[in-house]
């Protein structure tokens, strides 16, 4: 018997869960195909969510009513705002997670999602009909029909684990790889590449000398990821910090030839910003130590994740390395670290909707696109699932651009520039950082999510109430004003120019905060502290945001110049190099062309002039 759905999502990891939930929220009948329901929401590597750049993505997923932020709040056992001493634009919320609580909360959310059915099984082949996707076939022979398919296979595509001189096929420890899907992609015509990632050994926390390491508490009170989380109720823990030693490095150098990375056993690229401890020692030979963060994996689990010493050295070498690190001299290793290689698709095969250019109805999200990290996967999954549902229902696709959010920055980087190593999000990748802050993700995206039909009624009502409160607070702050002399009586030093300044303008001064303006106007104390914080940040950035708005307008002007179906050989003045690069990349807009390597401002000017001339000629011909 053949089942039928609007959308099928393959894989129950972070990308798959968001894709399936986003599709279902729009009303599309959605199937989530995964090996076992019990592995949904599993944290394959580090037990943490968020971080610099990554925390922005989590907040953006939340703004579109995605799952990750709320699940991370439910399972979070230590919350920290990274870069707190810096400006709000580059702060990154992060949470240490209890693996069991996180997975349980995700499974409950998936189970409770309307229009979503979980199917235990392994997708083995993509069904194609009439040049577009038509469904999937499972390894047990079952066929499932659909108008759209989202593939979110993580490290499972022809996954191969490496541990010292040993290697074996696996998607992750104790789970089989997905072999049939890789062959299916190749039959369709996709050229698959190989990437590598790794994980550290796991430790028995009861055998760690915690007195010998620095302890790191979380923020008090903890700040949630989701705007819908009133407060964190899960018990909070501390993490530990220790360092490798010269003895550690000597041991690694002595055995580096046994690492698959250096023996030639692994030839694929790994994540630049999350290198193995072997890589750190070889690449940074002048360092006498590297930080190791000891991260508990749960409230009732003694397992500790030593963040910073990912390795694929033989098991006995890993144990010897641990014994050279302060606090870990007598530690017991519950599972060795390892490296894993897996297939990926060149993300330049994708449209900004995350639909493949080669096959209509086929969408990809997560590590299959060359990214690394739970948060990057979740954001892609949401966009892919949303667009798959829109495609299945005959709706117009949605594209998030670089001025919309970090999810737009990431997707544009992937589909325009491609990757040579696993892609990780950082705040430095975004041109419009002042606009794209973690604290204003809902202000930027939730209204759009409501219009797209992926935001539930409860969040929509909360959002409208919050925006109304913020607008009222801003109007109130702008209606109150003081002269410099009046401000001086309250201890505030302003330029004695006689000009009255509103409470909102006063908040733009670096040395003036909400407490100072509330001391002048006590009625402001009635404003909700969360709204007051938003208002102060908006005031601090107001001048800069107005300047950035002009940059965004220019960016969107270039994005509006569409390059589809253009014959570059007919564009006079383009160099052969520019013409070749444009023909190969097939950018969708002049803005996207400008982000390609080797495309000069002069070439962009020629393209823009050509498009405008063509538009004038079409207008004249139709007159």
From Swiss-Prot:
GO biological process: tRNA methylation; tRNA wobble uridine modification
Cofactor or coenzyme needed: FAD
Annotated InterPro entries: FAD/NAD-bd_sf, GIDA_C_N, MnmG, MnmG-rel, MnmG-rel_CS, MnmG_C, MnmG_C_subdom, MnmG_C_subdom_sf
Keywords: Cytoplasm, FAD, Flavoprotein, NAD, tRNA processing
Alphabetized SMART domains for the sequence: GIDA_assoc_3
GO molecular function: flavin adenine dinucleotide binding
Highest taxon above the source species: Bacteria
Positions bound to FAD: 11-16
Subcellular location: Cytoplasm
Gene3D superfamilies: FAD/NAD(P)-binding domain, GidA associated domain, C-terminal subdomain, tRNA uridine 5-carboxymethylaminomethyl modification enzyme MnmG/GidA
CC per GO annotation: cytosol
Residues that bind NAD(+): 270-284
Pfam assignment, any one: GIDA
Biological role: NAD-binding protein involved in the addition of a carboxymethylaminomethyl (cmnm) group at the wobble position (U34) of certain tRNAs, forming tRNA-cmnm(5)s(2)U34.
HAMAP family per record: MnmG_GidA (MF_00129)
Subunit structure: Homodimer. Heterotetramer of two MnmE and two MnmG subunits.
Family classification: Belongs to the MnmG family.
Name assigned to this protein: tRNA uridine 5-carboxymethylaminomethyl modification enzyme MnmG
Species of provenance: Nitrobacter winogradskyi (strain ATCC 25391 / DSM 10237 / CIP 104748 / NCIMB 11846 / Nb-255)
This protein's encoding gene: mnmG
